[in-house]
Each structure stands twice: as structure tokens, then as C-alpha cells.
């Protein structure tokens, strides 16, 4: 746990916001088991905070990246497309795609990304839109992850968004955010970033999340949640030179 200083709001550009965050990382494991462990931990954290009505929305950036690669879109156009899809700006996406000389079949799939969110049915729909192997592999991983979450009874907390992207270009696989009512921003964000550590040395498969404690507490307050705290225990007070006896 620690304080972070970052500007994540489009309404306060140029101003840093201090917030308290807590999170976890799993490094050195690129398996779907690691994805499951981190997503389950996110759900456990939200449940332990007393939240009952919340959703963890999961996407996979490899679906989008597969389409970009096939269409040959990169540079400024790719960055603009990320922003527009992330904002669910359907008409902005349409205008940009119309200005590019790309295969209409790929363009049609990209145009649907702002609307490809919801239940597990979204994944089945997306799988029928393309034959791109990278895209289908991304869908397959999400389907398998959902099957595992269903086994442990956590599927009721899960929804999907294939338009879930990030201006942080380091995400390499699944990406997720946790939402609950009472606050207008995610309580938790995270995803897989297998190439990030490599910028500081050697590549290590990594997945993790960060939970905004301030946003979580605001949600708990507005939902009038009162989480019992165990205050039982013994307070041991001792002088500096009496540590051995205190132990």
C-alpha cells in the first residue's frame, strides 16, 4: 500500500491527484492460472470490503492488436483509434476508419468494438466476426478464464468489454477494471504486462492490479457499508531498552 501521484482524469488535465493504492503482482507466470488467481483476488478484495453489487469487466487487448496488425494501422492513427474506442465514441471511430485505406471487413469489426461489451455472449459474437488467429486466441483465453471463474462461483461478478483498451501501451493480454455504484470511476484497474519489466532488464511475464483505496472508501460510504473490524488483541507498551523482556 502507498500513495500515488497521477493525473487520470480528463477533467483536471495538468493537475496531479494524490491517492492511496493497494495492489498485487504475480511475476514469472504467463499462464491462464495466473490470470485466474489475480482476478479472483480482485473479487475477494471487493467482497471483503463489504461490496455486494459490483462487476469486474474484462477485455483482452490482443483482440484489438490482432486487428491493427492485419489492417496495417500504426503510429498516430493507432493511438487515436485507442482513445476513440476507449471513449465508446462510435462516430469518431467511424470517421477515422473512413479516412483510412483498409479492408472493409476489418474496418467493420473495429467499428463494432465500442459496442462489444456485456455478458459472455459478447465473446461468442466477436468470435464470429473474424478469422484472425490472434483475435480468436484472445477470445479463447477469455472463454477459458470464464469457465474457471464459473467453477468457483465468481462468474456472476464478471462481464466483458473487447473495447477495453488503455493509453498505457504496456498491456499485452487481459485487461480489467472493477466497478461498483456510488462512484464514477473504477475502484480497481489491472491487466497483463509481460514486456514491462523488460524495459528495466529482462522480460518477465507479469499480471497485477491496483485498487484505489480512496475510491473504494467513497463507494463504501455512499453504499452505507459498515464492515466489522476485529479490535481484539493486546497492546504491548515497552521502553526501548526493555525489548527482550517484552518479547
What are these regions (language model features)?
Residues 1-51, 97-247:
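Positively charged, Gly/Ser-enriched RNA/tRNA-binding surfaces
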Residues 17-22, 58-66:
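Short, conserved phosphate-binding/catalytic loop or strand-edge motifs used
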Residues 41-47, 63-70:
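Hydrophobic mid-domain F-helix/FG-region of cytochrome P450s
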Residues 53-63, 81, 159-163:
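Short, surface-exposed recognition loops or helix-turn segments adjacent to catalytic cores
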Residues 60, 88-89, 119:
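Short, solvent-exposed helix-helix connector turns and helix-capping sites enriched
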Residues 70-72, 174:
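Short low-complexity, flexible loop/linker segments enriched in glycine and/or proline
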Residues 73-95, 102, 154, 180:
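Acidic, His- and aromatic-enriched active-site or binding-groove loops in soluble protein domains
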Amino acid at each position: 500500500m502507498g500513495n500515488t501521484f497521477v493525473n487520470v482524469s480528463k477533467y483536471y488535465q495538468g493537475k496531479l491527484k494524490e491517492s492511496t493504492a493497494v495492489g498485487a503482482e504475480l511475476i514469472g507466470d504467463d499462464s491462464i492460472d495466473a490470470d485466474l488467481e489475480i482476478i479472483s483476488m480482485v473479487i475477494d478484495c471487493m467482497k471483503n470490503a463489504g461490496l455486494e453489487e459490483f462487476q469486474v469487466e474484462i477485455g483482452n487487448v490482443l483482440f484489438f492488436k490482432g486487428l491493427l496488425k492485419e489492417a496495417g494501422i500504426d503510429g498516430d492513427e493507432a493511438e487515436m483509434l485507442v482513445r476513440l474506442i476507449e471513449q465508446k465514441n462510435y462516430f469518431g471511430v467511424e470517421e477515422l476508419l473512413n479516412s483510412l485505406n483498409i479492408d472493409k471487413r476489418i474496418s467493420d469489426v473495429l467499428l463494432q468494438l465500442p459496442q462489444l461489451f456485456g455478458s459472455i455472449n459478447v465473446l461468442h459474437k466477436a468470435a464470429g466476426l473474424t478469422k484472425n488467429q490472434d483475435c480468436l486466441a484472445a477470445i479463447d483465453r477469455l472463454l477459458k478464464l470464464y469457465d474457471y471463474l464459473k467453477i468457483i462461483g465468481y462468474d456472476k461478478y464478471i462481464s466483458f468489454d473487447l473495447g477495453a483498451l488503455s493509453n498505457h501501451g504496456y498491456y499485452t493480454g487481459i485487461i480489467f477494471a472493477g466497478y461498483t455504484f456510488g462512484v464514477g470511476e473504477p475502484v480497481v484497474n489491472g491487466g497483463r504486462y509481460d514486456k514491462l519489466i523488460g524495459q528495466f532488464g529482462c522480460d518477465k511475464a507479469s499480471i497485477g492490479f491496483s485498487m484505489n483505496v480512496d475510491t473504494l472508501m467513497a463507494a463504501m460510504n455512499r453504499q452505507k457499508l459498515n464492515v466489522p473490524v476485529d479490535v481484539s488483541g493486546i497492546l504491548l507498551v515497552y521502553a526501548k531498552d526493555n525489548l527482550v523482556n517484552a518479547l
